Every structure is written in C-alpha cells, then in structure tokens.
C-alpha cells in the first residue's frame, strides 16, 4: 500500500508574530484546510521581516516541498518586504505587475500614491491565481503562493483557489482509551510493526474522567486503515476502549 501525498511548507512572516504582538492563526487554518485536501504539511517556519531571511527560507522550502504558502509582509509599509525577499531567494527581480497596478488605480482613483502602488510589486515571472473571483488575486511564483497576513483575507483567498491542491484524502479513526500510555504503548508498537505505513498518534488527555488517551489512526487507503483498526481493537485489553470516531 503506497499512496504518495503532496507536501507543503508554511512560512509565517512577521516581526509582530515573533514579538507576540500578534498571535498567528494562519498556520492552523492552512494545516487544517490542507489536511482536508489530502496535502501533508511537513514544516512551519516563523521568521522576521528580513529580505535575506525570507529569501533563504522560501527558496529552501520551494526545493523541499510541492507547495509553499507564505503569509504576511505584502502591504504598503516599510516593513512589508516579503515580495523582495522571495524575489531575492529565487534569483529574480521585483517588478510591477500591470494587472495589479490597474486594480489599485481603479480602486483608489486620485488617491493612489507610491506607497499603495508597492502592493503591485511582485517577483518577476509571478502569475495571478483566482482572478475573476477576488478583488486582489493570489500571487504565485513557481510553487510558492503568497498570501497576506490578515486571517480573514487569507481565508477568503485560499477558499477560492484551494481545489487546485486537492489530492487523495486522508481517512481517520480516533480511539479513546481508558488506559494510560504506559499500558498501551506496547500494543501501539506492535500495530506499527504490522502496519508500517499507518500514521499513528497517541495523545494523553489529562482533564477527562472518561478516557486517558486519544489514539489516532490515519491512512489514504481506507481498507488498510480498517484492517489496522480491527487489529488494534482485537489486541487491546478488554474494556480499554471508551469510544471510536472516524470517517
């Protein structure tokens, strides 16, 4: 059994996140959405608004993963250097995209200025995705998708383009157990020995009187998952299972 997942990396850009002025919720949203689309998020990085750092991180992610998602640093102010950083890392210039410039001029009219026009600057060779559905479409260069840091705007834009990332889904079963990890560890080890491609997780629960551990079993092969679940249930101590949930 082998169903290969597309992989993704997420780069959260912003001094305000690192200094705790803003709490990042974008990575959680993207992880949840991408998982539902069958994409495996392999890494999340939070970095400052520095051109060299952005360039190095995004270039490395672009080599390592099928998709890269960046958030933050695309506004009109002095610390919005994401476009310049990505361009630097990918070895291209920053240019003004004519379609974005036109949209900005139409929106702001006589109030347009150079600060606002900075939001039309993109890495050379970048394309726009989600056009027609969004006031400001998502900028993509190679496998890098560049999003703003404002959660509401990011979510709206991702929702428009998310189907392009869809792969085969993950199937999930969750088993809530009355026994602690010390009791069940050997059963989980045996399960992985029999089902080495199973994605198996074990999470202690401290504040629930009904169960002590939540065990998750995931696979892109539903039959494989069903067999693994049945083996686990057959080997656990009698009465250990509180309940089972899954898709």
Residue ranges of predicted features:
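Glycine-rich phosphate/diphosphate-binding loop of Rossmann-like nucleotide-binding domains
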Residues: 2-44, 49, 223-227
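Short glycine-rich anion-binding loops that position phosphate/pyrophosphate groups of nucleotides
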Residues: 15-16, 73-76, 151-153
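N-terminal small/polar loop signature for handling phosphorylated ligands or for N-terminal nucleophile
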Residues: 28-80, 85-88
């Amino acid at each position: 059994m082998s169903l290969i997942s597309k992989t993704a990396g997420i780069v959260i850009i912003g001094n305000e996140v690192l200094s705790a002025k803003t709490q990042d919720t974008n990575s959680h949203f993207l992880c949840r959405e991408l998982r539902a689309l069958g994409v495996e998020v392999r890494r999340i990085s939070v970095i400052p608004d520095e051109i060299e750092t952005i360039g190095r991180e995004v270039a490395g992610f672009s080599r390592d993963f099928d998709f890269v998602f960046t958030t933050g640093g695309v506004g009109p102010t002095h610390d919005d250097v994401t476009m310049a950083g990505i361009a630097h890392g990918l070895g291209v210039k920053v240019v003004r995209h004519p379609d974005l410039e036109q949209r900005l001029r139409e929106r702001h009219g006589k109030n347009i200025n150079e600060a606002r026009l900075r939001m039309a600057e993109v890495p050379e060779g970048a394309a726009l995705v989600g056009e027609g559905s969004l006031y400001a479409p998502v900028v993509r260069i190679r496998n890098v998708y560049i999003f703003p840091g404002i959660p509401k705007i990011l979510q709206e834009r991702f929702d428009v383009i998310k189907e392009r990332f869809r792969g085969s889904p993950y199937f999930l079963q969750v088993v809530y157990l009355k026994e602690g990890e010390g009791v069940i560890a050997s059963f989980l080890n045996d399960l992985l020995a029999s089902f080495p491609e199973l994605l198996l997780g074990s999470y202690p629960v401290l504040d629930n009187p009904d169960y002590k551990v939540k065990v998750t079993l995931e696979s892109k092969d539903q039959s494989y998952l069903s067999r693994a679940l049945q083996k686990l249930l057959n080997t656990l101590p009698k009465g250990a299972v509180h309940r089972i949930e899954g898709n």
